[in-house]
Curated annotation (Swiss-Prot):
This is Formamidopyrimidine-DNA glycosylase. Keywords: DNA damage, DNA repair, DNA-binding, Glycosidase, Hydrolase, Lyase, Metal-binding, Multifunctional enzyme, Zinc, Zinc-finger. PROSITE patterns: FPG_CAT, ZF_FPG_2. It comes from Desulfotalea psychrophila (strain LSv54 / DSM 12343). The keyword Transferase does not apply. It comes from the Bacteria. Its cofactor is Zn(2+). One of its GO terms (molecular function) is damaged DNA binding. It catalyses: Hydrolysis of DNA containing ring-opened 7-methylguanine residues, releasing 2,6-diamino-4-hydroxy-5-(N-methyl)formamidopyrimidine; 2'-deoxyribonucleotide-(2'-deoxyribose 5'-phosphate)-2'-deoxyribonucleotide-DNA = a 3'-end 2'-deoxyribonucleotide-(2,3-dehydro-2,3-deoxyribose 5'-phosphate)-DNA + a 5'-end 5'-phospho-2'-deoxyribonucleoside-DNA + H(+).
């Protein structure tokens, strides 16, 4: 599943290719995504509109139109975005496309079809967008994401720390890969209760999460199976994994074997010596 770094990389790659372009027509494969594809509304209200800017909120990408309408995309498990010449044959799992005024097509490809595309019409878009985002936590690379915020958010909770930082109501965009890597960098066992985390550990964890995410963005994201950027290229942060997917391999710090167990239903990787429970 694309996490924050992958979505950010896609946004950065797509933005210069579609901003300033006008949507000429929209279309779809007829196969349903996680939500029904609003093709009638898009054909009526988005055609003829200029794309003015793109924004990311967590794992959502918002495409703003010049009349105030907003197209909101979530990539789900296997979603990909790209821009192609209209003459180029569409791929098997291209389920949505926008024809642009420069004879290019902006295409959404999704093998497993767990992603979603919403259209927020002008006049209601801001209200609907705020409703969509109101339960999301802060951006981990934003100013409000601090150790004090994490400590306060953990009050009264008994979650494992890994489940806590993967909860989008607490903080957005941190999936399984970056939760594992951040906790290893912070030397915190993923199964520890949030109530056991000391203030200095909150400070270290907040810092490590930001460092890991920024490093991943610099590396173009992580390509495990499906992720490619807007130009079809792969990320290479996976070459920097310290624990994720490395069960029984030596810890890069102490050389002891990396362990793995299910926490919150997700595979968790950690060094039992460097990350004590």
């Amino acid at each position: 599943m694309p996490e924050l770094p992958e979505v950010e990389i896609i946004l950065r790659g797509i933005s210069p290719l579609i901003c300033g372009r006008t949507i000429v027509a929209v279309g779809g494969s007829g196969k349903q995504l996680r939500l029904p594809l609003p093709l009638p509304e898009l054909n009526r209200d988005a055609s003829g509109k200029e794309i003015t800017r793109l924004e990311r909120r967590g794992k959502y990408i918002s495409i703003f139109l010049n009349d105030g309408g907003i197209l909101v995309l979530h990539l789900g498990m296997t979603g990909q975005l790209g821009v192609f010449p209209k003459e180029q044959a569409r791929a098997k799992h291209d389920h949505f496309w926008c024809r642009l005024d420069n004879n290019q097509e902006f295409r959404y490809n999704d093998t497993r079809r767990f992603g979603s595309i919403r259209f927020l019409p002008a006049g209601k878009s801001r209200m609907l967008q705020e409703s969509l985002y109101q339960k999301l936590g802060p951006e981990p690379l934003g100013e409000t994401f601090t150790a004090d915020y994490l400590r306060r958010a953990a009050e009264g909770k008994s979650l494992a720390i890994k489940n806590f930082i993967m909860d989008s109501h607490i903080v957005v965009g941190i999936g399984n890969i970056y939760a594992n890597e951040s906790l290893f960098k912070a030397a915190i066992h993923p199964a520890r209760s949030v109530q056991s985390i000391e203030q200095e550990e909150w400070e270290k964890l907040a810092r490590c999460i930001q460092q890991i995410l920024l490093h991943a963005i610099d590396c173009g994201g992580s390509t495990i199976s499906d992720f490619v950027n807007a130009k079809g290229g792969q990320g290479y942060f996976q070459m920097n994994f310290k624990v994720y997917g490395k069960k029984s391999l030596p810890c890069p710090h102490c050389q002891g074997p990396i362990s793995s167990e299910k926490i919150g239903g997700r595979a968790s990787f950690f060094c039992p010596s460097c990350q004590r429970l």
